[in-house]
């Protein structure tokens, strides 16, 4: 039995609130249960130096956690003077995932900067961030089209993400912190709205997992992401 009494395939309640802040071209508060992440998308003219003159755009991401998003306060990374390896890994994952969803040629020489700030953490912050950031990205692209900056929508498809893992010997979907911290296997899966894979990050924290367990985890992720995409679409309708 899971601590929350959810079934193995049951995700936490997911809520997406658009236009959460006033200034960003796209802004979303995404909630996976008690995990809450603010995602903003800023549309900027120009591209990084390595892309100048190539007629294509760029999507990049930054990720951070507020000092009291966790049970005990942690120092801001800015105060420590450097980002942790975890932070760098997560923001690269978010950026890679979102770039897969955008036609960079249609974006033109423009950049979209995604900022994901964890307000409250209870497991699955990176998957919640990807899910919310995708909706913020859609709003930023629609803003640019409304301003006449873009003539064609560069979005190829929606993407979403969910965590899966093996907890007490059983594959489960959307781990909260108490499950994540004790899981034998922990995996993060990013998919398109049609169920194609973008990224799979999986680690045996305890016992190695079998091929059959891997397939079970991917099936759980596909089911969970399908439900999350439906919530994304409802929020955008």
Swiss-Prot record:
SUPFAM superfamilies from the UniProt entry: Ribonuclease PH domain 2-like, Ribosomal protein S5 domain 2-like
GO MF annotations, alphabetized: 3'-5'-RNA exonuclease activity; tRNA binding; tRNA nucleotidyltransferase activity
Q: What's its catalytic activity?
A: tRNA(n+1) + phosphate = tRNA(n) + a ribonucleoside 5'-diphosphate
Gene3D superfamilies assigned: GHMP Kinase, N-terminal domain (3.30.230.70)
- Database matches in InterPro entries: ExoRNase_PH_dom1 (IPR001247), ExoRNase_PH_dom2 (IPR015847), ExoRNase_PH_dom2_sf (IPR036345), PNPase/RNase_PH_dom_sf (IPR027408), Ribosomal_Su5_D2-typ_SF (IPR020568), RNase_PH (IPR050080), RNase_PH_bac-type (IPR002381), RNase_PH_CS (IPR018336)
* Positions with a binding annotation for phosphate: 86, 124-126
Listed EC numbers: 2.7.7.56
Sorted keywords for this record are: Nucleotidyltransferase, RNA-binding, rRNA processing, Transferase, tRNA processing, tRNA-binding
According to its UniProt entry, the protein's GO biological process terms are: rRNA catabolic process; rRNA processing; tRNA processing
Please verify whether the record's keywords include Phosphoprotein. no
- Functional note: Phosphorolytic 3'-5' exoribonuclease that plays an important role in tRNA 3'-end maturation. Removes nucleotide residues following the 3'-CCA terminus of tRNAs; can also add nucleotides to the ends of RNA molecules by using nucleoside diphosphates as substrates, but this may not be physiologically important. Probably plays a role in initiation of 16S rRNA degradation (leading to ribosome degradation) during starvation.
Q: Which NCBIfam families match?
A: RNasePH
Which family does the record assign?
Belongs to the RNase PH family.
Subunit and interaction comment: Homohexameric ring arranged as a trimer of dimers.
Full protein name: Ribonuclease PH
What is the originating organism of this protein?
Shewanella piezotolerans (strain WP3 / JCM 13877)
Lineage of origin: Bacteria, Pseudomonadati, Pseudomonadota, Gammaproteobacteria, Alteromonadales
Gene assigned in the entry? rph
